[in-house]
């Protein structure tokens, strides 16, 4: 087959399902605790037994509206719930309560920083079609999984059924797998900052379905849309998109049909595979739920909830760059997790310099956090203590080397760096007379090196600095040591 000259345009949209972090389910008081024994968090409402009526959890509405506001969506003053009819083992009622034609919020956007390897980082505005509330389905556990070792059949766990979801539907504004992954990551970041969801993809708290098609040019009609499921990481989203783009282009260029279907991402084989044909909205036979009244959100309530929104990641990134002088990279890393950003700001407020605070937090502290599976708000080493250590480095009381030496104990136990330095006798030697005496001894001990230095081999200054640090166990003030060494060696 000859190589095609067609420059295909990729069109991607994401449906992001965010489990809202309420203690009880969307229409009942049943618990939402993750990881408990199967089918222990169900009740007559979850199962849709005769005589039961759903009642909307008010916290779900609050979380959904706050999420919508953070995504710049317009909040509907009036919306409703609908029944989505379909038969599947994980749906105990044989219908799902969702929102169809009158969602809680529509027409929003977010800006996403896209960093592709080997390319310059750029910012892209991604439109968001809508956000609607719905209940989650149960979870099928299939034969051969870790949970059903040795089993030859599948079972269903209804603990997840009825958990509150906010489904966020993007507009088809994404053009690469990387853009799709960055968009999903930013949505999760926002949800975590708001505190409406933990966004844990491994536990299913955030799940993304990708809708993807290709067309020859931007002026052509959209191609046949394919939905991809079963991606539990941002890298999986990117890889699934990249594989599917190649698959569809190859099919079109070979004269084959691209079917409208749902496909699964196979992480092991790194490919998508057909799951089922894709249903249209008419197949679900939506109609208003007769057991649930309309949802009214007053202007007063909207303003109250808007006033409670925290500073969001994009605003923080901008502030860190413009006001604190941090690089775009540092600002991006620091704001990835709200607990890291909060820790950083507390250190700066305690007097730590912004750049050095960022370096220590994104370096040594972040590595410790990751290896010990902690968050920054679980650290024993308090922001005020890190600020104290940074000020000791700035004033020359300790060197960076000594700071790294005491850091492991501070991270594991916390405490005053100043006190720890005193207890260990690690304070810097800042007395010029003491340093001069040690340098005089070094000059007497290394006459050949002194002669070579004075003959023009200026690189030997590093040798003497090393010897001085060895003698003082790294405690000599580096700036003062260099000044005195230069003076003595030039004599």
Swiss-Prot record:
Pfam (any one): GatB_N
GO-annotated biological processes: glutaminyl-tRNAGln biosynthesis via transamidation; translation
Keywords: ATP-binding, Ligase, Nucleotide-binding, Protein biosynthesis
Known catalytic reactions: L-glutamyl-tRNA(Gln) + L-glutamine + ATP + H2O = L-glutaminyl-tRNA(Gln) + L-glutamate + ADP + phosphate + H(+); L-aspartyl-tRNA(Asn) + L-glutamine + ATP + H2O = L-asparaginyl-tRNA(Asn) + L-glutamate + ADP + phosphate + 2 H(+)
EC category name: ligase
InterPro entries on file: Asn/Gln-tRNA_amidoTrfase_suB/E (IPR017959), Asn/Gln-tRNA_Trfase_suB/E_cat (IPR006075), Asn/Gln_amidotransferase (IPR018027), Asn/Gln_tRNA_amidoTrase-B-like (IPR003789), GatB (IPR004413), GatB_C_1 (IPR042114), GatB_Yqey_C_2 (IPR023168), Gln-tRNA_amidoTrfase_suB_CS (IPR017958)
Entry's EC annotation: 6.3.5.-
Classification via SMART domains: GatB_Yqey (SM00845)
Gene Ontology terms for molecular function: asparaginyl-tRNA synthase (glutamine-hydrolyzing) activity; ATP binding; glutaminyl-tRNA synthase (glutamine-hydrolyzing) activity
Assigned protein family: Belongs to the GatB/GatE family. GatB subfamily.
Quaternary structure and interacting proteins, as annotated: Heterotrimer of A, B and C subunits.
Function summary: Allows the formation of correctly charged Asn-tRNA(Asn) or Gln-tRNA(Gln) through the transamidation of misacylated Asp-tRNA(Asn) or Glu-tRNA(Gln) in organisms which lack either or both of asparaginyl-tRNA or glutaminyl-tRNA synthetases. The reaction takes place in the presence of glutamine and ATP through an activated phospho-Asp-tRNA(Asn) or phospho-Glu-tRNA(Gln).
Protein name per the record: Aspartyl/glutamyl-tRNA(Asn/Gln) amidotransferase subunit B
Native organism: Prochlorococcus marinus (strain NATL2A)
Record gene name: gatB
């Amino acid at each position: 087959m000859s190589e095609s000259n067609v420059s295909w345009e990729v069109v991607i949209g994401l449906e992001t399902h965010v489990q809202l972090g309420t203690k009880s389910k969307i229409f009942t008081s049943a618990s939402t605790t993750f990881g408990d024994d199967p089918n222990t968090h169900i009740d007559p409402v979850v199962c849709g037994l005769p005589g039961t009526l759903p009642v909307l959890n008010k916290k779900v509405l609050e979380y959904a509206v706050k999420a919508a506001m953070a995504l710049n969506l317009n909040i509907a003053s009036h919306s409703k719930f609908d029944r989505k009819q379909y038969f599947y083992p994980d749906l105990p009622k044989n219908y799902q309560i969702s929102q169809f034609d009158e969602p809680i919020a529509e027409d929003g956007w977010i800006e996403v920083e896209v960093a592709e390897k080997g390319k310059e980082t750029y910012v892209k505005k991604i439109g968001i079609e809508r956000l609607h509330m719905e209940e989650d389905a149960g979870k099928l556990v299939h034969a051969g999984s870790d949970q059903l070792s040795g089993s030859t059949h599948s079972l269903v766990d209804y603990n997840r059924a009825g958990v509150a979801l906010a489904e966020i539907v993007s507009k088809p504004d994404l053009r690469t797998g990387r853009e799709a992954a960055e968009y999903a990551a930013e949505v999760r970041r926002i949800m975590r900052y708001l505190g409406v969801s933990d966004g844990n993809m491994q536990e299913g708290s955030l799940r993304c379905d990708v809708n993807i098609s290709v067309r020859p040019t931007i002026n052509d009609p959209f191609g046949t849309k394919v939905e991809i499921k079963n991606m539990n990481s941002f890298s999986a989203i990117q890889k699934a998109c990249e594989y599917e783009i190649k698959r569809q282009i190859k099919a079109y260029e070979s004269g084959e049909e691209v079917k409208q279907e749902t496909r699964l991402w196979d992480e092991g084989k790194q490919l998508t595979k057909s799951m089922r044909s894709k249903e249209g909205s008419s197949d679900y036979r939506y109609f208003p739920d007769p057991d649930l009244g309309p949802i009214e959100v007053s202007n007063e309530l909207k303003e109250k909830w808007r006033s409670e929104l925290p500073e969001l990641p994009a605003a923080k990134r901008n502030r860190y760059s413009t006001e604190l002088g941090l690089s775009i990279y540092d600002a991006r890393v620091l704001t990835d997790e709200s607990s890291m950003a909060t820790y950083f700001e507390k250190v700066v407020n305690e007097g730590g310099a912004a750049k050095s605070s960022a370096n220590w937090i994104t370096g040594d502290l972040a590595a410790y956090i990751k290896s010990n599976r902690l968050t920054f708000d679980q650290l024993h080493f308090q922001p005020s203590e890190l600020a104290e250590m940074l000020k000791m480095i700035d004033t020359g009381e300790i060197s960076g080397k000594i700071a790294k030496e005491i850091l492991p104990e501070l991270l594991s136990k916390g405490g005053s760096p100043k006190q720890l330095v005193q207890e260990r006798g690690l304070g810097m030697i800042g007395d010029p007379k003491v340093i001069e005496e040690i340098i005089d001894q070094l000059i007497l001990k290394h006459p050949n090196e002194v002669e070579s230095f004075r003959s023009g081999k200026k690189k030997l200054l590093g040798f003497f600095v090393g010897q001085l640090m060895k003698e003082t166990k790294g405690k000599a003030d580096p700036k003062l040591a260099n000044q005195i060494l230069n003076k003595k060696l030039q004599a």
